[in-house]
Amino acid sequence: MLKVVFFGTPQFAVPYLEALLNHPDIEVLGVVTQPDKRRGRGSQLIPSAVKKVAIAHDLPVWQPKRIKKDPETLAILENLQADVFAVVAYGQLLSPQILQMPRLGCVNGHGSLLPKYRGAAPIQWSLVQGETVTGMTTMLMDEGMDTGAMLLKAETPIDLWDNAHDLAVKLATSGAALLTETLIQLAQGKITPIPQDPDQATYAPLIQKEDFQLDWQKGAIALHNQVRGFYPNCLTTCRDKPLKVLETIPLVPECFAQYPAAYEPLKEFVGNTGKVGEIVAIAKKFGPIIQTGDGLLLLKQVQPSGKKPQSGWDMVNGMRLTVGESLG
């Protein structure tokens, strides 16, 4: 029986923990997760998604504020004598002392095909950059940020209509199976770790608020990728008030092959032109069509300031938008 301690925090990490719990040859000794956070009305303390699963399975849970400087937690982890630590979206860097504790080391599941998109937000940046394929990589952790030797990979195609939430769900499903397979094969000595080539590395840094701002001078495809990559946070303005843009359709011939049948009528709007940021047409039942720096972009789903998400068509009717008005 392979003895594992799981480190993870958000919903993305939950399928990984569940896959370990369901494997007949793996024993999960306990879970390390981030401290409960105060949220919502009354500032209630809310446990992490991973902690909820751990409690449901009667697992021990440790929640150090700073694991590097928590001698009590470090002593507990040392005494567990785990074979391996499995780490997925934990949220803290692990010290060399922790990395060296388990017999087989610490294995991380990372949401990209390393060495591409090292860093905190690989799912979001792979979408923003317009990648058509991504995946999960398991690696042996070292002291660097996603620089450890690679173990196994699983590729996942990216659809033109995937947003960050959709892709996270896909990767969590494939990644959970990959992590369990990695741990079993590692224990059996069947994997040869492959060092990463630093010359091939690209980065996925922490997302900043300014990344959410839409610049209509950009092309339609670039804006579409930004909206789905940073979903549900991208912003413009409409009549001087903030407008969240949640879903778009690029009216660009190179995207036509990926249109579902329902989008076919939109192709007839491609000839429209106007000033950058201007509403050049309104597609019935869909929404406003905006002129970008290169091509047209339809706003399929939006969230006006102070309101719930709604279709672009509902916004057109609710605000009585007209051709010639400008956004941003």
UniProtKB/Swiss-Prot annotation:
It comes from Picosynechococcus sp. (strain ATCC 27264 / PCC 7002 / PR-6). The keyword Transcription regulation does not apply. It catalyses: L-methionyl-tRNA(fMet) + (6R)-10-formyltetrahydrofolate = N-formyl-L-methionyl-tRNA(fMet) + (6S)-5,6,7,8-tetrahydrofolate + H(+). It is an enzyme of class 2 (transferase). (6S)-5,6,7,8-tetrahydrofolate binds at residues 112-115. It comes from the Bacteria. This is Methionyl-tRNA formyltransferase. InterPro entries: Fmt, Formyl_trans_C, Formyl_transf_N, Formyl_transf_N_sf, Formyl_transferase-like_C_sf, GART_AS, Met-tRNA-FMT_C, Met-tRNA-FMT_N. PROSITE patterns: GART (PS00373). Its EC number is 2.1.2.9. HAMAP family: Formyl_trans. The gene is fmt. Belongs to the Fmt family. One of its GO terms (molecular function) is methionyl-tRNA formyltransferase activity. Keywords: Protein biosynthesis, Transferase. GO terms for cellular component: cytosol.
